[in-house]
């Protein structure tokens, strides 16, 4: 990240606060520069700043949740449509309706499913540390913005000892050629280009459909960087990870912090001889049916979805 456009909203505020502190202290990023932090008047302003900053070739990030994320949706459509790589870090939180609720669920990120952002989910603080670089690297190589999310409070405020990335490892994993290509694509008076122009129906649809090839290729790009993480850390991250009995007949599909709890329940049940398992969803958008079919046990008779039932059920059925 070279620029962070921020506006505080619970429970995402500590992320922006840490970046602001690190910037003020002169802490460098992997490119050897200090992150420029810009606090705006609202989340809508922060999203607009992200869009503009990306347009001039700066690697840009923001942090938000709930109604704050909803205010960013208009710019998210533009960012995705222009294939500008960035990462929105979201501590997923309930969207307030009849009453305010600051606790975690996925109603805010589900509202962004149609924006064109890829969506990557983590279970616990260690996974956030391990997989956030995957979002950044895949965004650059895949030319697609990412919404990197985890459960508000349950994960965002969890106190846990973690293994941290070394900056040299991060630099080694970063696709520098993609970074240079992104910067070369920036708005520049020396090689002017038109952005956000008007198109009539004769070409608008064709241009909109042309991006499908990018999304079709993206799961393989994400998997590539997950494998790089696995090589460095000895982990086994995948687009979907299976946990449980190899001959499970009942399988739960879940996403987010609930996975750690489900794993403990599966350990208890399999010790008693029950054939149960868990599929952990990591890459939620674009959904890879091919990848999830590889991890569903051939013996499975029942699939149950926890916490992600309606939106993910549509994906699973398709």
Residue ranges and their predicted role:
Residues 306-318:
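Single conserved hydrophobic/aromatic residue that forms the stacking wall/gate
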Residues 99-102, 221-237, 254-262, 281-289:
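A general structural motif
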Residues 102-152, 176:
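Conserved thiamine diphosphate
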Residues 93-94, 150-157, 256-258:
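Glycine-rich beta-alpha junction loops
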Residues 31-35, 146-241:
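Conformationally flexible catalytic loops at phosphate/diphosphate-handling active centers
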Residues 242, 246-274, 287-294:
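Redox- and metal-dependent alpha/beta enzyme cores, enriched for Fe-S-associated oxidoreductases
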Residues 20-22, 77-79, 136-138, 163-166, ...:
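Short, solvent-exposed amphipathic alpha-helical segments in soluble enzyme
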Residues 1-111, 116, 133, 153:
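Thiamine diphosphate
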């Amino acid at each position: 990240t070279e620029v962070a456009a921020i506006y505080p909203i619970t429970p995402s505020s500590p992320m922006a606060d840490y970046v602001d502190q690190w910037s003020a202290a002169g802490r460098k990023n992997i490119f050897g520069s200090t992150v420029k932090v810009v606090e705006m008047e609202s989340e809508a302003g922060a999203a607009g700043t992200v869009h503009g900053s990306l347009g001039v070739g700066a690697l840009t990030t923001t942090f938000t949740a709930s109604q704050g994320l909803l205010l960013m949706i208009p710019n998210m459509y533009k960012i995705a449509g222009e294939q500008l790589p960035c990462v929105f870090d979201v501590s997923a939180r309930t969207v307030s309706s009849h009453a305010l609720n600051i606790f975690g669920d996925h109603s805010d990120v589900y509202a962004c499913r149609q924006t064109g952002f890829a969506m990557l989910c983590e279970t616990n603080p260690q996974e956030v540390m391990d997989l956030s670089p995957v979002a950044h690297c895949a965004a650059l190589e895949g030319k697609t913005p990412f919404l990197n999310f985890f459960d508000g409070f349950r994960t965002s405020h969890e106190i846990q000892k973690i293994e941290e990335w070394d900056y040299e490892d991060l630099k080694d994993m970063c696709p520098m050629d993609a970074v240079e290509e992104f910067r070369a694509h920036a708005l520049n008076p020396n090689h002017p280009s038109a952005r956000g122009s008007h198109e009539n129906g004769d070409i608008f649809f064709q241009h909109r459909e042309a991006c499908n090839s990018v999304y079709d290729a993206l799961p393989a790009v994400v998997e590539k960087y997950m494998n790089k993480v696995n090589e460095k850390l000895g982990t086994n991250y995948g687009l979907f990870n299976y946990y449980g009995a190899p001959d499970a007949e009942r399988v739960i599909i879940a996403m987010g912090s609930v996975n750690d709890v489900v794993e403990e329940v599966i350990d208890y049940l399999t010790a008693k001889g029950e054939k149960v398992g868990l599929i952990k969803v990591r890459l939620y958008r674009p959904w890879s049916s091919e990848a999830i079919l590889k991890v569903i046990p051939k013996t499975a008779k029942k699939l149950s979805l926890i916490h992600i039932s309606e939106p993910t059920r549509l994906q699973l059925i398709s």
